[in-house]
C-alpha cells in the first residue's frame, strides 16, 4: 500500500505552481488577488486529485506501515508526483490567459473609476467569431489558435470558406494597454509613450492625444518614412548621409517622423539615425512609430493602465512577431483583432497623415502642415504606397534615396528616364529588362512584375512630386544633403507663392533653403512683401533670416516703425528675459496682461543707464509724436480693444497738441533704426541679434558701450532680485563680450587713423542722449577703453587745456600762478587746435562771439519743431560731461560751426594776450594747482585755529577757514543743481556717484554744527571739539588730491578697496570680541550695577589686546583668603583660559586673515593699477574741467558772476542752461564722414577677426581633423578596391588555367571535325578548310553574300532565307565555297560619341584592366601544332572573361567587289607583372582563324581591307549576384566545374565588399594595322604574334556607391555591354541550411517572413488606392480575403541554365511566332539568355533539356560537350556576356536614317538599331537575331542557353534595284532556339540550302544574345503558318545571279540527317559518329518557337547608305560618332 509522504503534499505543488505563476504576474502586472484565487482553485483541484489517487490519512503524524519494498514505494510516489504536477501545469497554461483577461477587464471597473481620457476615447479590438483559416483549421483567420480564441455565446464558428473582416467579426472594447515603455539595455532606460487603439480611431482624437496627453507641439513638418520591412544593410556612406540628413531635417524644422515602429527594415535604420541624437529629453525628435498590435512581441506585457513597462528590444528571428524600436519616443499600436498579421496600421496611418496635412501651421496663416514621404529601400508595398501618395489629393511629395536598394532604386531609375508625356520611349525600350529586374528584385512572378512596372510608370507621371537623393561628390562644392533634398521637394511639389515659401522656411528656420530656393536670381518682391517676414524673423530670433532679408532689399529704416517696435517689446517669442522684473521697479502696479509702451521702455533704459542718460522715449518731444502715430496706426497695427488699453497714459493730456500736429509717415520712423533694435535685443536678452544689430548702422563704438552698460545694470538687477545665478553670469558674459568688441574696434580705428579715432571718442552722440563715447565708457566702467592710448591722449590734451608744454609743466603752472606776467612766456596752442579740442557748448558759443545774437535765435516752440527735430536728442552729459538741466535745441548754434571755414585760416595763428590769460586760468591743470594751493593754505589756517586757544572772537585765520568751508559748500550745491536729471533725487544720486562728494558734504555739515556751538559762550568748547574732529577728514581729503599722481593714485584706490573689505572683517572681529569680552566681564565683576560704562568695560580690554596690550594683571587678579587680598570670585580661574583662547583666535587667526585679504586686494589692484589710475584720471579731469576758475574762498566771485549771468539771460528770455560736457561739435557732413570711417573700421575689424580665427590653433585643428577624415575615407575606399582587384586577378588566373584544360579538348574535337568535313565535302580544292566554325561554342551567324558574277542565279530565296531580295541559308561547316577569291578584311572598332554616358570601358568591377590590341594575321597559315591551338583557345577563352565587347564592322559599298570582312577570333592575355594593383591584362587578338567572316564574291583587290579593331571588354564583371548564383549550378558539375564554382564563391565573398558607381569615360581608337591575306591555303596556319604595348587606362577610384539604378543605367547607356546582375545574398541564401551559420539561417527565416508581410501590405494598399474617394471609410483597406496565395510568384532570378538530361525525351513542336519565341528557352518566354538563329535555324536536340537555372559560368562553358563522359557538366550561356539590348533611342541615328528612307518606315525602339520595314512585305521570315551590336566577342567559345546551339546560317540577299547586290556585314544577335524545334529547323535549313544557288549569298556569324519578344512584334511581321517556300518564290530574280553550282553543291552534299551538325554546334558526345547525332537531333523540347520575318529590300538600302558614312569616316582616320553610325 502506497501512502503520501505528508498530508500537505498537494500544497507543495500549489506552492510550486504559484511560484511559476508569480513569475508570469511579474511581467503581466497581475495583482496578488488573482494569484490567490488561482491558488484556491488549484488547491481544490489538487485535493480532488489526491482523493482520487491517495487514501485519507488518519492523522497528520500517522504513517501507514509499508508492506511493499522500498524501491517500489519510491517509484510509485514519484509517479504520483509527476502525474499531479503535469496536470497542474496544464491547468496553469490553460487558465493563466483567462485570469489575465479577467483581471484586465475588472481592473478599470474597480480601480479606474472614472475612466481616464485615453480609456474613454480609445478602444481595442477582439475577434468574436472563429473562422478557420484555409491553411490551418486549428487557427482562426485572425491568427489566434482555437484553444485560446474567445467564444461568445450565440455566435457560432464559421466555415473555412468564409471571409473574415475586422469590422464584422471583432468588437470594440475600451483599451487596456497604455502607459510608458522603459527600454532597457543602456546606461539609462529610454522611455516611450504607447497606447493600444482601434484601427478605425478618428485622427482628431490622435492629434488631441499628442497635444493634450503627451504635451507635444503640432509639427511644422511631417516626414513619413516608407521602406522595406525586411532587414537590409545600407552602404556605409549612404547610411551616414541618411542618418545625418534625417536627424537634421527633423531637429531644425520641428518635424514629426512617422515610421512602422518595429525594429525591422527601414524603421530600424531610422532608429539608428535617432541614436545619434543622444538621450536628452528636451528637444528630442518626435518619432512616432505606428505598428500593428498583433505583431508586437510579448504584447501581453504591455497590458495595463498608465503603466511603466520595462522592455528589452531583443527580437527572435524564428518568431513571426517583431519588437518595438527602442529609439522611438511614441508608439501607436493599432489593433484590428488580428494576431501576427501586418497591415492593421496602414489605413490609420494614412488617415492621420492626411488629417495633419490639413492643419494650419499658424493660426493666422493659410499654409498647412507640409507632409513629405521618404523612401528608403522598400518592397512591393513601398511602390504602391508611393503611388498612393503621388496620386492622392492633395498629393504628397516623395523623396527617394537612390542606392538604398530595391524599390527606391527602381523608382529612382524610372524617375530619371520618365518623360512628361504619355509616351515613354526609353522606358518602353527597356520594358522587358525592367520587368526582369523587378522579378529578380522582389522575387515575384511575371504577371505581378508587369503590374509593378505599370505602377512605376504611374508614379513617374507625377514627376515633379518625386525627388531623388543621391550622394554625389561635386568638385565645385558640397553636394546637396538629405535634409535639403527633403525641404526642396516640398517647394517643388507645392506650388506656393514666394511669400508662402518664405514663411515655411522661416517656420523651419532653414535659411539655406530660403537662400537656394526662394531668393533666386530674377525673383522680384513687391514693396513691403518682405516686411512681415522680417517681423517674424525678429520675433522668433532668426538671426540668419534677418541677415538674409537685409541682404535682399529690406530697408530697416522703412521697416521699423513705432508700432512695430512696440510690438517687438511685447512679443511672447524669444528667450526668457528680465525686462518684466525691471519694469515692475519703474511701474510698481502693473496689471496682468499689461502691454508695454515705449515710454515704459524709456523709463527702464534711464534706470539702467543711470542718471546721466535720458532715453528718447521719455523726452517731451517724443510724447506727441508717439500719441499721433499710435492713433493713426491703431486700426492697422493693433486690435482696437487692446490698443485703447495699452495706449500711453500721457497721450490724452496732449490731445490738443496731437490734434494740431500734422501727421506724416516719416514721423513713425527712426533716424537710426539699428540703434533702437540693439536696445530691444539687449533688453530682451537676444545676444546674437544684438551683435547683428551692432554690426549694422552707424555709431558702432557707442552702441557697444551702451550695450555693455545695459547688460551690467541688468546683471546687477538680477543679482538684487535673487534670480538664478546663471542669469547673472550670462548677462555679465554678454557685457564682457561687448566690452571686448568695443575696445578692439577702438584699437583698430586708432591704428588706421589716430585723429579720427579721437574724434570718435569725443564727438557728440545725438542718438545717445548727446553724450560722448568717453562719458559712456565711464558710465559703463570700461577701464580698458579709458586706458587705451587714444583715450589717454585726449585726457592729456584736456588736462593741459590751451597750454602746450612738454617739460616741467607743473613748475611752470605754479610759477604762472605766482607771477602772472610769466604767462606770456608759456607756449599755447593755436586757435585752430583749440577749436578741434573737446569743449562745452558755452565755450563753443563764446569762442564764436555769438552771445550777442542769442536774442535773435531764441528756440522755437516744441510743437513747431516736432516734425523736423523729433529725433534730435537734447540730453546733456552728466558729471563726466554732464551739466545741462533741460532740453535744448542744438541746431540753432550748430550752423555757425563750420570746419571748412577754419581750414581757410592760417594753421598757426597765435593767440592774443587776453586769450592766453583766459586759456591759462581755465585749463584743468591750472585749476588743480590753484585749488590744491588754496586747500593747503586752508589746512594750515584750520590747524592753527584748532591748535591754539580759541578766543571769544575768531581770528582772521579762523575767518578764512570758515569762508573756505562755506564757499566749498556752495560749490557742492552748484554741482548738485548743475547735474542733468530733473528730479532732485536723481540729481543727488548722480552727485553722490563720487564717494568724496558725500564725505565733503558730511564734513561741511559737521563744521557748520561746530560753528554754531562755537559762537555760543557756554558751548564754545563743544564747538572747538567738533572743529578738532572735523579736521581729521580735511587732512584725509588730501588723498583726493594725491590721486592725480601716477604712483600715488593706485595706492589711494587700494586703500579705498581695503577699507570696504575691512568693514566685513570688523563684523567678524566684533563677534569674537563680544563673545569673550562679555564672558570675562561677567565672571570678574558679578556684582556690577547697570551703567553705560559696561559697554566700554566689555570691549575696551579685549579690543586693545589685539594690538599687544595684554592687561595681564586684570586677566588674573590676585585673590585669596588673605585679608590683604580681595576674595576670589567663583570661577575666577576660567578667565585666563577664555582670554587665552580669545587671543589665539583674534590676534592670530583674524588678524592674519585680514592681512591675507588685504594682500589679495593689493595683488588685484596692482595688476590693473595702471588702468585704475587712468580711469581715475578721467574723473579728475572732468571734475576740474567743470570747476570755476577761482578756488575757495574766492570761488564766491565766480558764483556771483554765474548767478548774475543767469538772471540776465532769464530776463532776456534766453535758454540759460547749456551742456558743459566736453564734446566735439561737428557739422553734419563732417559727422557723416566720421561715420563712414567708423563703418570702414567695423568691416576691417571683422575681416581681421576672421583672419585671426582662421589662424587660431582650434580652427586649424578642426580643419586638419576634417581633412584627415576625408583622406581616411578615401584611403579606405582605395584599400577596399585594391583587395577586390587582387581577388579578381587571382580568380581570373584560376579560371584561365581551367580554360587551358578545356581548350585542349576543344581543339581535339576541332581536329576531328576538320577531318570529318574534309572527307565529306566535295570540291575540297575549291573550298578552303578553316577552323572558323567552332561548333557549338560560338553564338554567331555568318552570312555569305555571293554576287552574280561569282555564281549562277537561282530561284528566289527559301522561307528560311531572309527577305524579298535574297535568301539567307545556313551554311554548314563543311560547305564548299570558292573562298580563295574572297578577301578577308579586318574589322575596325569606331569610337563612341563623346556625349555618350556609359560605364568604364575595359575595367572590371574589381579593377582588372583588359585591352584588345589587334595584330596582323595570316589567314592561310595552318595551325600545325597542338600547342599553338591550345594557345589560341586560351586567348579565346580569356576573351570570354571580359564583361563585353562591342564589335562593329565598317563596310564600304561596292556592287561587284569581293570583300571579306574578317575579325581575329582569338586573343592572348598578357598580364603586366608588377606590384601595382592597377596592372591590366592586355588582350592581343591572334589571327589566322576565319571565324566570323563575311564573304562577298568579287574582285580580289587588296586595297579594300580596312583595319580590324576590337572594343575591349568593359563594365563590371563579377558582382555579388553574378557569382553567388553559381552555387546552384555546382551540384551537377564535374570536379573541374566544381573547382571553378568554388573560385566564384570565394570571389563572391570579396566582391560583395565593394560597390562602385560607373564613371564617364570614352574609348580611344587603336592604331591598327592591315592584316595581310595569303591565298591558296586549304588549312589555316599558325598566326604570328606581335607584342604590342597596352594602353594606359587609369583606374578611377570611386567613393560613391552603386545601386540598382546603376545597373539599369548600364543597360540604358551601354553599347551592347553586359548588365551586371543585382547584388543579393543569393550565395548565402541558396546554400543548404546545413552549410549556413545559425545567424544566417535566422536572418533567412526572418527575411522570408517579412517579405510576405510586404506582400500583404501591398495588397492592402491596393484596396486603399481603389477606395481613394472614401479614405475616411472605416475599413475598406481591410476588406480583403485573409489567405493570399503567393503561388504565382516567381523566384528572384530568371533561370535559363541548360542541364544535360539525356534521359528525358524531347517533344517535337511546330514553329510559332518568332516574336514570341525568339527569346524563349526551355519553354519560358521571358528567358533572355536563349539563342536564336538568323535565317533558318538548324536545331539540334541531343536528348538535352532546358532547366530553369541561371547561367553564370559562361567563361568556362567550353567544357560542356567536350567530354563524352556523363560526368562532364553542362554550361549555359550567361546574361553576363549576352545581355538584353539597351533601351535608349538616339536622336541622331533616327535623323540620319530618316534622311535616306521612305515614309513607310518603322524604327524599332532599340537604341542603336533602326530596321526599316517595307509596307509590302508579306511572306518574309527572319529569326530573332537582329541586333547590330553584339555584347561579346564573335569568336568566343560558348554554349547557348537552350538545348539548341548557336547556328551558323547562310543568308542570301539579292539587291532589288539595279540588279546589284549590296552586302552589309554586321554581327547579329540570335534568338534562343529550343531543342523542340530541331526537326523543323533541319527542314528549314535544308530547304534554304537547296535554294542558295539562286541568289547571292551573304555569310554572317553572330552570337546569340537574348532578344525582347515585345520588340519583335513591333518591328517585324510574323508569319506563323506559311511554308517557307513562299518567301523564296516571292524573291525576284536578278540578272546577276550567284554561282548556282557551288550553292547546289552545298545543299546536295549535305545529308539530311547531318543537317543539325551543319547549322549548329557539332560538339556532341561523340564527334565521330553521325548516327548518334541523327538520333539525338530528332528530339525536341521547345514547342513554341516562332521566327519573325522581315523584308530586306529597304533594309539593305539603308544599310548601304549608312555604311558609306562609316567608310568615309574611316578613311578620314576619324572614328565616327556612335550615334550616327548605328545600323
UniProtKB/Swiss-Prot annotation:
Q: Spell out the Basic residues composition-biased ranges.
A: 71-81
- What's in the GO CC field? cation channel complex; plasma membrane
**From which organism does this entry originate?**
Drosophila melanogaster (Fruit fly)
How the protein is affected by changing residue 1915 to R? In RNA edited version
Q: What is this protein called?
A: Transient receptor potential cation channel trpm
Q: Which family does it belong to?
A: Belongs to the transient receptor (TC 1.A.4) family. LTrpC subfamily.
Membrane topology for this entry? Answer: Multi-pass membrane protein
**Molecular-function GO terms, alphabetical:** inorganic cation transmembrane transporter activity; intracellularly phosphatidylinositol-3,5-bisphosphate-gated monatomic cation channel activity; monoatomic cation channel activity; zinc ion transmembrane transporter activity
Q: Does the keyword Chaperone apply?
A: no
Q: Where is this region: Disordered?
A: 56-81, 833-858, 1346-1365, 1471-1507, 1556-1585, 1698-1734, 1751-1770, 1814-1844, 1874-1904, 1919-1939, 1962-1990, 2003-2023
Q: Any idea what job this protein has? A: Calcium channel mediating constitutive calcium ion entry.
- Stretches of Polar residues bias are at 1753-1764, 1814-1835, 1978-1990
What the entry lists under Pfam families is as follows:
Ion_trans, LSDAT_euk, TRPM2, TRPM_tetra
Instruction: Tell me the Gene Ontology biological-process terms attached to this UniProt entry.
Output: intracellular zinc ion homeostasis; magnesium ion homeostasis; metal ion transport; monoatomic cation transmembrane transport; protein tetramerization
Q: Which UniProt keywords apply?
A: Ion channel, Ion transport, Membrane, Phosphoprotein, Transmembrane, Transmembrane helix, Transport
Q: Which residues lie on this side of the membrane: Cytoplasmic?
A: 1-653, 949-992, 1046-1057, 1158-2023
Coiled coil (UniProt feature): none
* Bias type Gly residues, positions: 1351-1365, 1711-1724
Its annotated compartments are: Membrane
**Record's superkingdom?**
Eukaryota
Which InterPro entries does UniProt cross-reference here? Ion_trans_dom (IPR005821), TRPM (IPR050927), TRPM_SLOG (IPR041491), TRPM_tetra (IPR032415), TRPM_tetra_sf (IPR037162)
Residue ranges crossing the lipid bilayer per the database entry: 654-674, 928-948, 993-1013, 1025-1045, 1058-1078, 1137-1157
Locate the Phosphoserine modifications and list their residues.
Answer: 858
Residues in the Extracellular compartment per record: 675-927, 1014-1024, 1079-1136
UniProt lists compositionally biased (Low complexity) regions at 56-70, 1725-1734, 1886-1895, 1966-1977
Amino acid at each position: 500500500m502506497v501512502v503520501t509522504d505528508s498530508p500537505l503534499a498537494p500544497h507543495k505543488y500549489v506552492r510550486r505552481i504559484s511560484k511559476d505563476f508569480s513569475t508570469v504576474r511579474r511581467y503581466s502586472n497581475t495583482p496578488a488577488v488573482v494569484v490567490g484565487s488561482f491558488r484556491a482553485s488549484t488547491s481544490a483541484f489538487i485535493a480532488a486529485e489526491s482523493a482520487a489517487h491517495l487514501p485519507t490519512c488518519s492523522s497528520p503524524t500517522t504513517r501507514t506501515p509499508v508492506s511493499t519494498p522500498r524501491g517500489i514505494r519510491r517509484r510509485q510516489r514519484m509517479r504520483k508526483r509527476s502525474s499531479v504536477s503535469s496536470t497542474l501545469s496544464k491547468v496553469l497554461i490553460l487558465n493563466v490567459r483567462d485570469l489575465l483577461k479577467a483581471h484586465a477587464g475588472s481592473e478599470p471597473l474597480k480601480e479606474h473609476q472614472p475612466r481616464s481620457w485615453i480609456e474613454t476615447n480609445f478602444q481595442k479590438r477582439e475577434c468574436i467569431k472563429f473562422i478557420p483559416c484555409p491553411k490551418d483549421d486549428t487557427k482562426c483567420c485572425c491568427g489566434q489558435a482555437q484553444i485560446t480564441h474567445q467564444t461568445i455565446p450565440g455566435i457560432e464558428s464559421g466555415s473555412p470558406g468564409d471571409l473574415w473582416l475586422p469590422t464584422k467579426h471583432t468588437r470594440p472594447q475600451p483599451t487596456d494597454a497604455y502607459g510608458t515603455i522603459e527600454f532597457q539595455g543602456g546606461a539609462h532606460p529610454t522611455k516611450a509613450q504607447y497606447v493600444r487603439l482601434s484601427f478605425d480611431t478618428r485622427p482628431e482624437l490622435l492629434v488631441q492625444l499628442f497635444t493634450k496627453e503627451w504635451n507635444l507641439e503640432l509639427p511644422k513638418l511631417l516626414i513619413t518614412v516608407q521602406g522595406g520591412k525586411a532587414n537590409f544593410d545600407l552602404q556605409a556612406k549612404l547610411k551616414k548621409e541618411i542618418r545625418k540628413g534625417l536627424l537634421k531635417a527633423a531637429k531644425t524644422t520641428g518635424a514629426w517622423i512617422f515610421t512602422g515602429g518595429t525594429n525591422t527594415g527601414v524603421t530600424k535604420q531610422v532608429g539608428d539615425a535617432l541614436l545619434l541624437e543622444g538621450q536628452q529629453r528636451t528637444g528630442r525628435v518626435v518619432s512616432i512609430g505606428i505598428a500593428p498590435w498583433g505583431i508586437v512581441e510579448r504584447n501581453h506585457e504591455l497590458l495595463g493602465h498608465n503603466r511603466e513597462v520595462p522592455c528589452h528590444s531583443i527580437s527572435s528571428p524564428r518568431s513571426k512577431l517583431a519588437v518595438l524600436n527602442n529609439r522611438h519616443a511614441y508608439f501607436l499600436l493599432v489593433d484590428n483583432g488580428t494576431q501576427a498579421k501586418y497591415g492593421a496600421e496602414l489605413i490609420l496611418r494614412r488617415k492621420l497623415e492626411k488629417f495633419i496635412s490639413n492643419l494650419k501651421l499658424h493660426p493666422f496663416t493659410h499654409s498647412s502642415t507640409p507632409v513629405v514621404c521618404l523612401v528608403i529601400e522598400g518592397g512591393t508595398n513601398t511602390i504602391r504606397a508611393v503611388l498612393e501618395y503621388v496620386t492622392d489629393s492633395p498629393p504628397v511629395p516623395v523623396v527617394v534615396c537612390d542606392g538604398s536598394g530595391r524599390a527606391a532604386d527602381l523608382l529612382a531609375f524610372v524617375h530619371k528616364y520618365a518623360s512628361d508625356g504619355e509616351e515613354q520611349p526609353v522606358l518602353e525600350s527597356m520594358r522587358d529588362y525592367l520587368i526582369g529586374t523587378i522579378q529578380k528584385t522582389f522575387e515575384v512572378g511575371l504577371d505581378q512584375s508587369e503590374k509593378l512596372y505599370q505602377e512605376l510608370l504611374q508614379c513617374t507621371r507625377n514627376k515633379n512630386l518625386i525627388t531623388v537623393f543621391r550622394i554625389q561628390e561635386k568638385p565645385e562644392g558640397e553636394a546637396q544633403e538629405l535634409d535639403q533634398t527633403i525641404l526642396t521637394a516640398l517647394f517643388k511639389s507645392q506650388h506656393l507663392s514666394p511669400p508662402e515659401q518664405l514663411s515655411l522656411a522661416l517656420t523651419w528656420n532653414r535659411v539655406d533653403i530660403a537662400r537656394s530656393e526662394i531668393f533666386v536670381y530674377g525673383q522680384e518682391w513687391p514693396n513691403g512683401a518682405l516686411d512681415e517676414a522680417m517681423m517674424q524673423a525678429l520675433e522668433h530670433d532668426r538671426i540668419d533670416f534677418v541677415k538674409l532679408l537685409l541682404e535682399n532689399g529690406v530697408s530697416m529704416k522703412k521697416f521699423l516703425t513705432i508700432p512695430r517696435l512696440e510690438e517687438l517689446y511685447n512679443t511672447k517669442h524669444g528667450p526668457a528675459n528680465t525686462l518684466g522684473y525691471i519694469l515692475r521697479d519703474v511701474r510698481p502696479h502693473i496689471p496682468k496682461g499689461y502691454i508695454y509702451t515705449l515710454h515704459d521702455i524709456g523709463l527702464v533704459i534711464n534706470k539702467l543707464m543711470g542718471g546721466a542718460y535720458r532715453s528718447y522715449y521719455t523726452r517731451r518731444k517724443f510724447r506727441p509724436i508717439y500719441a499721433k502715430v499710435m492713433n493713426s496706426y491703431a486700426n492697422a497695427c493693433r486690435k482696437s480693444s487692446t490698443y485703447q488699453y495699452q495706449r500711453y497714459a500721457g497721450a490724452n493730456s496732449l490731445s490738443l497738441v496731437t490734434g494740431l500736429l500734422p501727421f506724416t509717415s516719416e514721423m513713425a520712423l527712426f533716424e537710426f533704426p539699428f540703434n533702437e533694435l540693439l536696445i530691444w535685443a539687449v533688453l530682451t536678452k537676444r545676444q546674437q541679434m544684438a551683435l547683428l544689430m551692432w554690426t549694422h548702422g552707424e555709431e558702432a563704438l557707442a552702441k557697444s558701450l551702451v550695450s555693455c552698460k545695459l547688460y551690467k545694470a541688468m546683471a546687477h538687477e538680477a543679482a538684487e532680485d535673487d534670480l538664478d545665478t546663471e542669469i547673472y553670469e550670462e548677462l555679465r558674459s554678454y557685457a564682457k563680450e561687448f566690452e571686448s568688441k568695443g575696445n578692439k574696434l577702438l584699437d583698430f580705428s586708432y591704428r588706421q587713423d589716430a585723429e579720427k579715432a579721437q574724434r570718435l571718442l569725443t564727438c557728440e552722440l545725438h542718438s545717445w542722449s548727446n553724450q560722448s563715447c568717453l562719458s559712456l565708457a565711464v558710465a559703463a566702467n570700461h577701464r580698458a577703453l579709458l586706458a587705451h592710448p587714444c583715450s589717454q591722449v585726449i585726457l592729456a590734451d584736456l588736462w593741459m587745456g590751451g597750454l602746450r608744454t612738454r617739460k616741467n609743466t607743473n613748475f611752470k603752472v605754479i610759477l604762472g600762478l605766482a607771477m602772472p606776467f610769466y604767462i606770456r612766456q608759456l607756449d599755447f596752442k593755436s586757435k585752430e587746435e583749440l577749436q578741434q579740442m573737446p569743449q562745452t557748448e558755452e565755450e563753443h558759443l563764446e569762442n564764436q562771439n555769438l552771445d550777442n545774437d542769442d536774442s535773435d535765435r531764441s528756440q522755437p516752440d516744441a510743437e513747431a519743431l516736432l516734425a523736423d527735430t523729433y529725433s534730435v536728442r537734447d540730453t546733456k552729459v552728466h558729471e563726466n560731461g554732464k551739466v545741462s538741466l533741460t532740453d535744448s535745441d542744438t541746431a540753432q548754434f550748430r550752423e555757425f560751426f563750420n570746419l571748412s571755414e577754419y581750414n581757410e585760416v592760417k594753421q598757426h595763428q597765435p593767440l592774443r594776450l587776453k586769450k592766453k590769460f583766459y586759456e591759462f586760468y581755465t585749463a584743468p591743470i591750472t585749476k588743480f594747482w590753484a585749488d590744491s594751493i588754496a586747500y593747503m593754505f586752508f589746512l594750515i589756517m584750520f590747524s592753527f585755529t584748532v591748535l591754539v586757544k580759541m578766543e571769544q572772537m575768531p581770528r582772521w585765520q579762523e575767518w578764512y577757514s570758515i569762508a573756505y568751508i562755506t564757499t566749498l559748500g556752495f560749490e557742492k550745491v552748484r554741482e548738485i543743481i548743475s547735474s542733468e536729471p530733473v528730479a532732485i533725487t536723481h540729481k543727488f544720486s548722480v552727485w553722490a556717484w563720487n564717494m568724496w562728494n558725500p564725505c565733503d558734504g558730511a564734513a561741511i555739515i559737521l563744521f557748520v554744527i561746530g560753528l554754531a556751538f562755537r559762537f555760543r559762550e557756554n558751548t564754545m568748547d563743544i564747538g572747538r571739539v567738533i572743529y578738532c574732529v572735523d579736521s581729521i577728514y580735511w587732512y584725509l581729503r588730501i588723498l583726493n588730491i594725491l590721486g592725480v599722481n601716477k604712483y600715488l593714485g593706485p595706492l589711494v584706490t587700494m586703500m579705498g578697496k581695503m577699507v570696504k573689505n575691512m568693514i566685513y572683517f570688523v563684523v567678524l572681529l566684533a563677534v569674537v570680541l563680544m563673545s569673550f569680552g562679555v564672558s570675562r566681564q561677567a565672571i570678574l565683576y558679578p556684582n556690577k550695577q547697570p551703567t553705560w560704562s559696561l559697554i566700554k568695560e566689555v570691549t575696551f580690554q579685549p579690543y586693545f589686546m589685539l594690538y599687544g596690550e595684554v592687561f595681564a594683571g586684570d586677566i588674573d587678579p590676585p585673590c585669596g583668603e588673605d585679608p590683604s587680598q580681595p576674595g576670589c570670585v567663583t570661577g575666577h580661574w576660567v578667565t585666563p583660559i577664555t582670554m587665552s583662547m580669545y587671543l589665539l583666535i583674534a590676534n592670530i587667526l583674524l588678524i592674519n586673515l585680514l592681512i591675507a585679504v588685504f594682500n589679495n586686494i593689493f595683488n588685484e589692484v596692482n595688476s590693473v593699477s595702471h588702468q585704475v589710475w587712468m580711469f581715475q584720471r578721467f574723473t579728475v579731469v572732468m571734475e576740474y574741467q567743470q570747476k570755476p576758475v577761482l578756488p575757495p574762498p574766492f570761488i564766491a566771485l565766480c558764483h556771483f558772476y554765474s548767478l548774475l549771468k543767469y538772471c540776465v539771460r532769464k530776463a532776456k528770455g534766453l535758454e540759460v542752461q547749456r551742456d558743459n560736457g566736453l564734446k566735439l561739435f561737428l557739422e553734419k557732413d563732417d559727422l557723416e564722414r566720421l561715420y563712414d570711417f567708423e563703418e570702414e573700421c567695423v568691416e576691417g575689424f571683422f575681416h581681421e577677426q576672421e583672419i585671426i580665427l582662421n589662424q587660431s590653433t582650434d580652427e586649424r585643428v578642426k580643419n586638419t581633423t576634417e581633412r584627415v577624415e576625408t583622406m581616411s575615407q578615401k584611403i579606405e575606399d582605395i584599400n577596399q578596391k585594391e583587395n577586390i582587384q587582387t581577388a579578381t586577378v587571382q580568380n581570373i588566373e584560376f579560371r584561365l588555367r581551367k580554360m587551358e584544360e578545356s581548350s585542349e579538348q576543344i581543339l581535339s574535337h576541332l581536329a576531328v571535325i576538320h577531318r570529318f568535313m574534309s572527307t565529306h565535302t566535295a570540291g575540297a580544292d575549291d573550298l578552303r578548310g578553316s577552323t572558323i566554325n567552332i561548333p557549338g561554342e560560338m553564338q554567331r551567324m555568318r552570312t555569305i553574300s555571293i554576287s552574280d558574277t561569282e555564281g549562277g542565279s537561282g530561284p528566289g530565296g527559301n522561307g528560311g532565307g531572309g527577305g524579298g531580295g535574297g535568301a539567307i541559308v545556313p551554311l554548314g561547316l563543311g560547305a564548299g565555297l570558292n573562298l580563295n577569291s574572297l578577301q578577308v578584311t579586318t574589322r575596325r572598332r569606331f569610337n563612341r560619341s563623346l556625349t555618350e554616358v556609359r560605364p568604364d570601358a575595359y575595367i572590371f568591377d574589381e579593377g582588372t584592366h583588359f585591352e584588345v590590341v589587334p595584330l596582323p594575321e595570316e589567314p592561310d597559315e595552318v595551325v600545325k601544332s597542338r600547342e599553338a591551338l591550345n594557345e589560341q583557345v586560351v586567348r579565346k577563352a580569356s576573351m570570354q572573361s571580359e564583361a563585353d565587347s562591342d564589335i562593329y564592322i565598317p563596310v564600304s559599298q561596292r556592287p561587284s567587289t569581293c570583300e571579306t570582312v574578317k575579325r581575329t577570333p582569338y586573343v592572348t592575355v598578357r598580364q603586366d607583372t608588377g606590384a601595382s594593383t592597377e596592372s591590366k591584362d592586355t588582350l592581343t587578338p591572334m589571327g589566322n582563324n576565319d571565324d566570323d567572316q563575311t564573304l562577298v564574291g568579287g574582285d580580289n583587290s587588296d586595297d579594300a581591307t580596312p583595319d580590324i579593331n576590337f572594343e575591349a571588354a568593359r563594365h563590371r564583371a563579377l558582382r555579388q549576384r553574378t557569382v553567388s548564383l553559381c552555387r546552384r549550378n555546382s551540384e551537377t558539375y564535374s570536379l573541374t566545374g566544381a573547382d571553378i564554382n568554388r573560385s566564384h564563391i570565394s570571389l563572391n565573398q570579396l566582391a560583395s565588399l565593394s560597390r562602385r558607381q560607373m564613371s564617364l569615360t570614352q574609348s580611344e581608337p587603336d592604331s591598327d594595322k592591315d592584316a595581310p591575306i595569303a591565298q591558296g591555303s586549304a588549312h589555316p596556319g599558325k598566326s604570328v604574334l606581335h607584342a604590342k604595348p597596352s594602353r594606359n587606362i587609369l583606374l578611377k577610384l570611386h567613393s560613391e556607391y552603386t545601386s540598382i539604378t546603376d545597373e539599369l543605367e548600364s543597360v540604358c547607356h551601354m553599347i551592347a555591354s553586359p548588365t551586371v546582375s543585382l547584388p543579393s545574398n543569393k550565395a548565402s541564401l541558396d546554400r543548404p541550411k546545413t552549410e549556413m551559420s545559425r545567424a544566417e539561417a535566422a536572418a533567412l527565416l526572418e527575411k522570408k517572413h517579412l517579405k510576405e508581410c510586404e506582400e500583404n501590405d501591398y495588397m492592402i494598399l491596393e484596396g486603399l488606392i481603389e477606395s481613394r474617394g472614401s479614405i475616411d471609410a472605416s475599413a475598406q483597406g481591410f476588406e480583403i480575403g485573409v489567405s493570399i496565395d503567393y503561388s504565382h510568384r516567381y523566384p528572384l532570378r530568371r533561370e535559363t541554365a541548360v542541364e544535360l538530361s539525356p534521359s528525358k525525351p524531347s517533344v517535337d513542336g511546330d514553329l510559332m511566332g518568332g516574336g514570341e519565341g525568339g527569346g524563349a528557352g526551355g519553354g519560358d518566354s521571358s528567358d533572355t539568355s536563349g539563342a536564336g538563329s538568323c535565317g533558318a535555324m538548324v536545331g539540334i536536340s541531343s536528348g538535352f533539356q532546358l532547366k530553369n537555372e541561371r547561367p553564370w559560368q559562361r567563361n568556362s562553358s567550353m567544357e560542356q560537350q567536350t567530354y563524352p563522359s556523363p560526368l562532364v557538366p553542362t554550361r549555359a550561356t550567361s546574361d553576363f556576356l549576352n545581355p538584353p539590348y539597351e533601351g535608349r533611342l538616339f536622336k541622331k541615328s533616327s535623323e540620319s536614317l530618316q534622311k535616306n528612307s521612305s515614309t513607310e518606315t518603322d524604327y524599332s525602339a532599340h537604341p542603336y538599331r533602326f530596321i526599316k520595314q517595307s509596307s509590302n512585305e508579306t511572306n518574309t521570315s527572319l529569326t530573332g537575331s537582329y541586333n547590330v551590336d553584339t555584347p561579346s566577342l564573335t569568336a568566343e567559345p560558348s554554349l547557348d542557353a537552350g538545348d539548341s546551339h548557336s547556328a551558323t546560317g547562310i543568308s542570301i540577299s539579292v539587291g532589288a534595284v539595279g540588279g546589284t547586290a549590296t552586302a552589309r556585314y554586321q554581327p547579329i544577335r540570335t534568338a534562343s532556339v529550343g531543342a523542340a524545334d530541331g526537326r523543323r529547323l533541319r527542314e528549314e535549313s535544308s530547304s534554304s540550302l537547296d535554294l542558295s544557288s539562286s541568289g547571292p549569298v551573304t555569310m554572317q556569324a553572330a552570337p546569340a544574345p537574348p532578344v525582347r519578344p515585345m520588340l519583335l512584334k513591333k518591328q517585324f511581321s510574323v508569319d506563323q503558318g506559311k511554308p517557307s517556300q513562299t518567301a523564296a518564290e516571292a524573291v525576284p530574280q536578278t540578272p546577276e545571279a550567284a554561282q548556282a553550282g557551288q550553292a547546289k553543291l552545298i545543299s546536295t552534299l549535305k545529308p539530311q540527317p547531318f543537317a543539325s551538325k551543319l547549322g549548329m554546334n557539332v560538339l556532341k558526345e561523340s564527334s565521330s559518329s553521325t548516327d548518334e547525332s541523327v538520333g539525338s537531333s530528332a528530339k525536341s523540347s521547345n514547342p513554341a518557337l516562332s521566327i519573325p520575318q522581315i523584308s530586306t529590300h529597304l533594309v539593305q538600302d539603308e544599310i548601304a547608305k549608312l555604311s558609306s558614312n562609316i567608310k568615309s569616316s574611316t578613311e578620314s582616320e576619324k572614328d565616327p560618332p556612335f550615334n550616327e553610325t548605328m545600323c
